[in-house]
Amino acid sequence: MRKAALGCALAALCLLPTLTFAQIGFISSWLDMVTQTQSQQPHWITPLATTTPRLEQEFRYDIQWQTHNSGVTTDNYGVSKGLEIIPEKNVEVILAVPPYIVNNPDSPQDGFGDWQFLVKYRIAAGNEEHGNYILTAFYQISFPTGQYQEGVKSPVITPTLAYGKGFRNFDVQGTLGGGLPTGNNATIGRTILWNNTLQYRIRKKIWPETEFNFTHYYEGSHDGHSLLYITPGLVLGRFPIHNRFSFTFGGGFEIAATSFHPTNHIPILSIRFPF
């Protein structure tokens, strides 16, 4: 019995290097696929509020400080960002970390918001040498996991078409989609979401931008209203750290441009680690 156990242990030890090399080989092949996939699209930076049509691989953490018309301020830690990964050619998956919402003045009902994920499929793209454009489809769904009233009461599906076009150092990135609740329409309401970002690159790593974030509401408490935020901002990056690993950060300020606006004057901070 002891000899059999010893033999199994020795066999396992002999297999460990093989498994390790296999794992390293898998990771290396996967990262090579990611590099090739990203080389076939424009190399713009991801905007602050608009979801980029590019396929990106990074971990992202944002913070927003929202001021409501009532005078209450809300600190949003995370802003439904998280892990962005490219598992297959032309595909990206975003696994968001539920945001943590803090209401000021102090509230006993601070808590986590809804969890969501987003899948991108890149339909067509050309890098800077082959047209400098991209077209991507999104499928996003959020789940009512929020604590207290920090989320909505039903899952919300958001199909979206994203697009982008570059002209030398200037680019436009945009999305057009709709938020479709699977229930409680009278409370949650449906939305049309249209976002556009104008971006300019200076010295390769400095990206000033202006975003236009438009929402129109059907049903729900905001039925018939339209909302537009204009968001000037600046993103800096990508700063190499080691091999594929790099660092990007940016900030901006959302300003309501319509008479209807539940919140206004919203600072944004964004931190990203592309890999």
Locate the predicted segments by residue:
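Transmembrane beta-barrel domains of Gram-negative outer membranes and organellar outer membranes
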Residues: 22-275
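Cleavable N-terminal export/targeting peptides
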Residues: 1-31
